[in-house]
């Protein structure tokens, strides 16, 4: 493998990974809003679990979401002078906020990488072309579809195990397990809430990634056709110049 080929393969991998990160981040954002959270809490019977009225559930949830997304991450929430979260739960939510912040920081970097890859493809340096850039996007999006479907199958078969593995990857052991009978955090966001939200996020990822792969495939083919046409025109012009006899002086 020559140096140019290795660089192209590396570029394809970087673009593919960046595409997967950006699509995933875009799919997560809609589910961080109070409208979805309220809808899903209604479906999973949060008022019955907490023993609170719907307005009280909304007050507590909105405060938690505000500290999670906007900050500061104090997570000091009260309902009828009752402190909703314990010290351990507040510490866990600060950890959650740190994971989200890191994820979206990486997503922002991935956007910059994609923009840079397309800018470089316009320069045609190191053999990196616009066709390569679109191919990387298509590979990343298609791979994300396959990965999401596979993860979805695993989650449907063993959601609790998948949930545990996910938490072990990002959180210290023992900091994220709370008693559903007494923990308001678990009652506000029960397992059914997370399982249904995970399905919705996964479905949106598949839709966005599938559309991205389709668009990237079309753009890549169009770029290849345009490049071939331009190359053919240039070759034809050169042939005509060679075949034309020089004028007699």
What are these regions (language model features)?
Residues 1-37:
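Hydrophobic secretory-pathway targeting helix
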Residues 111-159, 211-227:
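Juxtamembrane interface at the cytosolic side of transmembrane helices
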Residues 19-29, 54-62, 139-164:
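Hydrophobic alpha-helical membrane-insertion segments
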Residues 174-227, 246-249:
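Terminal transmembrane helical module of multi-pass membrane proteins
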Residues 38-83:
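Membrane-interface interhelical loops and short interface/amphipathic helices
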Residues 154-180:
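Juxtamembrane non-transmembrane "cap" segments at the membrane-aqueous interface
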Residues 69-109, 191-201:
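Individual transmembrane alpha-helix segments
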Residues 1-8, 220-249:
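Actinobacteria-biased recognition of intrinsically disordered, low-complexity terminal regions
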């Amino acid at each position: 493998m020559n140096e140019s080929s290795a660089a192209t393969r590396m570029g394809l991998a970087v673009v593919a990974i960046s595409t997967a990160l950006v699509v995933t981040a875009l799919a997560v954002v809609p589910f961080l809003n109070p409208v979805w959270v309220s809808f899903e809490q209604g479906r999973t019977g949060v008022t019955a679990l907490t023993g609170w009225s719907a307005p009280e559930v909304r007050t507590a949830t909105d405060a938690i979401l505000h500290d999670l997304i906007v900050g500061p991450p104090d997570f000091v929430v009260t309902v009828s002078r009752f402190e909703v979260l314990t010290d351990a739960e507040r510490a866990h939510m600060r950890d959650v906020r740190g994971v989200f912040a890191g994820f979206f920081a990486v997503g922002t970097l991935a956007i910059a990488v994609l923009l840079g890859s397309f800018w470089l493809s316009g320069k045609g340096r190191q053999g990196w072309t616009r066709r390569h850039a679109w191919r990387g996007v298509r590979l990343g999006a298609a791979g994300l579809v396959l990965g999401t479907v596979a993860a979805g199958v695993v989650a449907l078969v063993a959601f609790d195990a998948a949930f545990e593995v996910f938490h072990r990857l990002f959180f210290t052991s023992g900091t994220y397990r709370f008693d559903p009978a007494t923990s308001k955090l678990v009652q506000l966001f029960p397992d059914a809430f997370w399982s249904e939200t995970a399905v919705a996020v996964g479905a949106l990822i598949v839709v966005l990634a599938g559309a991205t792969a389709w668009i990237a495939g079309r753009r890549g083919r169009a770029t290849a056709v345009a490049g071939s046409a331009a190359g053919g025109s240039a070759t034809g012009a050169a042939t005509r110049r060679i075949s034309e006899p020089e004028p007699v002086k």
